[in-house]
Amino acid sequence: MTEERRREGELGAAARPAIGRGFRLQWEAAQQAHVLLYPEGMVKLNGSAGEILKRCDGQRTVAEIVTDLETAFGASGLTNDVMAFMAIALTKNWLEIRE
């Protein structure tokens, strides 16, 4: 099984995602956006991506992150969108699943 598929298979409601090794999430005031910094550069995140990633601390589960987002933004039914973004972030190594 490839590393990409292994990681995607680990992504479920009980998974505990964290920012991937080699990346650092921070607020960039000059750009008014969250960014992911890595040795070769920077990724400017849209608002939704920043809100999701800043909750990925390796302690909270995906289910807890979704609940927190739904509460913070008065929304419901965010699970599929959050999971889809996290799956993409895993393939880009922005996220990793912690035990």
Regions found by a protein language model. Give the residues of each.
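Acidic, low-complexity/disordered tracts enriched in E/D and polar residues
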Residues: M1-K54, R98-E99
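Long, charge-rich, low-complexity alpha-helical segments
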Residues: G41-E99
